[in-house]
């Protein structure tokens, strides 16, 4: 675009570390040792130093131009503001962003976006699906699509076991955290050569329920296909039940989806086919890259 920094009005970031700060801090006090708490707070300070980096490398002060937009608000904006619709129900879900894993909104053209429900970390459909993805031998960040595809080759015979791990909660769902190993209860993505990597999320109790995890070079067997099928169908049922509950309560005809979990095209197809919403709208990119555009669209 050949723009200079002084020609840019605002720099919008699809994270806001102050959002859910109270919830994050209280969670840390309950679950982390003091050293880890300090490390987390230091990371927050580092993330806020974007203006310092810009000043260092470009010799330009942008501190008054940087706007931090809550993560899921940016996600859902990347869907709603691309559409020519008057109103919709917004549903954003992923692993976690600003400590929220699900946020549900009322979306109306010309009005402020209104959040009506949210689910906080560590209850997360994204982390739940990711743990199974690792267990099935797909270790790379973003490998969940392989499990979604594998599901079509199996039968959902392990749904009863999955129901031991994820259950209906007061707002949406709750995870039995004893089946997970979150390493100090907060997941960190470390980066090596630009690629995120992380430890296994499933615990020994998880392995007692489903057996030995598949190695990355092990053959894919019937049990792996059936676990994938059971996982996929369980997620579809959980999400469909929730959006139908929301449809009945709020009477919206349109549904906007966003967040990393909405990359699950099989789930999206089931929503189109089985839900009572008239239309489903998606972001051009429901992941974090699209959320960056959503942050700018919202602001």
Residue ranges and their predicted role:
Residues 1-299:
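Short acidic/glycine-rich loops and adjacent helix/strand connectors
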């Amino acid at each position: 675009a050949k723009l200079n920094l002084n020609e840019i009005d605002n720099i919008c970031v699809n994270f806001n570390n102050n959002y859910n700060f109270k919830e994050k801090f209280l969670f840390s006090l309950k679950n982390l040792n003091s050293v880890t708490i300090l490390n987390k707070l230091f990371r927050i300070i580092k993330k806020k130093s974007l203006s310092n980096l810009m000043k260092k490398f470009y010799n330009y002060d942008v501190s008054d131009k940087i706007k931090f937009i809550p993560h899921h608000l940016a996600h859902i904006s990347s869907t709603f503001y691309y559409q020519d619709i008057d109103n919709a129900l917004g549903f954003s879900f992923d692993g976690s962003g600003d400590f929220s894993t699900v946020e549900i909104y009322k979306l109306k053209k010309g009005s402020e976006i209104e959040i009506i429900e949210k689910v906080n970390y560590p209850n997360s459909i994204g982390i739940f699906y990711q743990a199974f993805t690792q267990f099935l031998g797909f270790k790379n960040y973003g490998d969940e699509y392989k499990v979604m595809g594998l599901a079509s080759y199996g039968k959902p015979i392990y749904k009863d076991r999955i129901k031991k791990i994820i259950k209906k909660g007061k707002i949406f769902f709750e995870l039995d955290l004893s089946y997970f190993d979150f390493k100090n209860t907060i997941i960190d993505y470390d980066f090596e050569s630009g690629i995120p990597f992380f430890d296994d999320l499933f615990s020994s109790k998880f392995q007692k329920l489903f057996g030995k995890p598949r190695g990355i070079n092990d053959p894919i067997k019937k049990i792996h296909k059936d676990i994938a099928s059971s996982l996929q169908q369980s997620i579809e049922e959980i999400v469909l039940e929730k959006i139908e509950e929301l449809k009945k309560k709020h009477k919206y005809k349109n549904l906007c989806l966003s967040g990393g979990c909405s990359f699950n095209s099989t789930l999206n197809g089931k929503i189109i086919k089985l839900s009572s919403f008239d239309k489903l709208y998606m972001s051009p990119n429901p992941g974090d890259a699209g959320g960056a555009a959503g942050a700018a669209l919202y602001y």
